[in-house]
Amino acid sequence: MRRNRSHYSAVFGAELLLISALVLVVSGPALAQTAAGSFVSVSGQVQIQRAGATIGAASGVGVDVADRIVTGADGHGVIVLNDRSRLELGPASNITLDEFTITGGSTSTRVSLVSGVLRSLVNAASGGAPANYQVHTPNAVASVRGTRFDTAYTE
């Protein structure tokens, strides 16, 4: 029996749609963004600004690349990144986590400090490789390979 082309096109289209849907379902979790770290301590007012929404920070809440963290006049927050480095934010602080990557045993982190105080405790990457850690302010850049230091910026 001879079938017309439109029948085969419809069957092929349905199969293609089914395969595409299956690929999305299977790969969806792999495409989801993994948090760069999480809050381990929060006191006072601490908020995360993420993709146009504002989220109240609390212990255990994840921090993603591109998140802006803002503390109130009474706010303090401690974030532990996935490489075990710590970011400690003081009152009236405003930072953005611009970059956090772990690739082949090396870590690269970039934080923008818009205002306030940030204490950084930077760990060496796994295997003892130095971490590439930068704090950018509106008029300076601090770049370290594994140490602890404070950065403050006021307008």
Residue ranges and their predicted role:
Residues 1-11:
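N-terminal secretory signal peptides that target proteins for export/translocation
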Residues 27-31:
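C-terminal region of N-terminal signal peptides and the immediate post-cleavage residues
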Residues 32-155:
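Flexible, surface-exposed loop/linker segments and immediately adjacent secondary-structure boundaries
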Residues 13-26:
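Bacterial N-terminal signal peptides
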